[in-house]
């Protein structure tokens, strides 16, 4: 079975550092990243454009992050246009692949991306928004992607903000406490 780079880094380096820093009695108390949620909210376009948009979004996320994901769709009709919400849940190996690509390749290339503050950590969960995730890619539905805000939620197993902060800072996420 293929082990990705971030998972081996967690097992060999981060787990050991957290164990020595906080003196856990049991190794199962050491926090880890449970899952990653990506949401795209309030798309308002005609129904044919929405499904083409969804198809291209799935293709792009598969090509960029090499993921297979489960998406939940919520459609509400508003006269001629529709309100469309998309939620992508990444678990186990997929969230490590996504975080590895996000931290090492895409966050440094996003224009005007600031360091995340401690206010984005709530009960051990990190929430942040990215306005222009697909600025690097140019294709015919670029106008649809430029207007959208991607909300990324990283859930950890700890409820303590300081433990979550130390875990995420060891993953080299740009976060300031």
Regions of interest found by a model, annotated:
Residues 1-177:
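Ribosome-associated RNA-binding proteins
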């Amino acid at each position: 079975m293929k082990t990705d780079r971030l998972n081996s880094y967690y097992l060999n380096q981060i787990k050991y550092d957290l164990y020595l820093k906080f003196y856990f009695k049991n190794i199962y108390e050491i926090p880890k990243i449970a899952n990653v949620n990506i949401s795209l909210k309030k798309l308002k376009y005609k129904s044919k454009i929405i499904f083409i948009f969804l198809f291209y979004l799935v293709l792009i996320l598969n090509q960029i992050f090499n993921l297979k994901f489960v998406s939940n769709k919520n459609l509400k009709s508003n006269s001629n246009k529709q309100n469309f919400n998309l939620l992508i849940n990444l678990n186990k190996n997929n969230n490590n692949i996504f975080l590895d690509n996000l931290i090492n390749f895409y966050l440094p290339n996003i224009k005007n991306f600031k360091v995340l503050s401690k206010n984005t950590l709530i009960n051990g969960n990190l929430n942040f928004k990215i306005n222009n995730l697909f600025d690097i890619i140019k294709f015919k539905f670029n106008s649809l992607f430029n207007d959208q805000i991607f909300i990324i939620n990283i859930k950890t197993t700890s409820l303590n903000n300081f433990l979550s902060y130390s875990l995420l800072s060891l993953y080299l996420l740009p976060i300031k406490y």
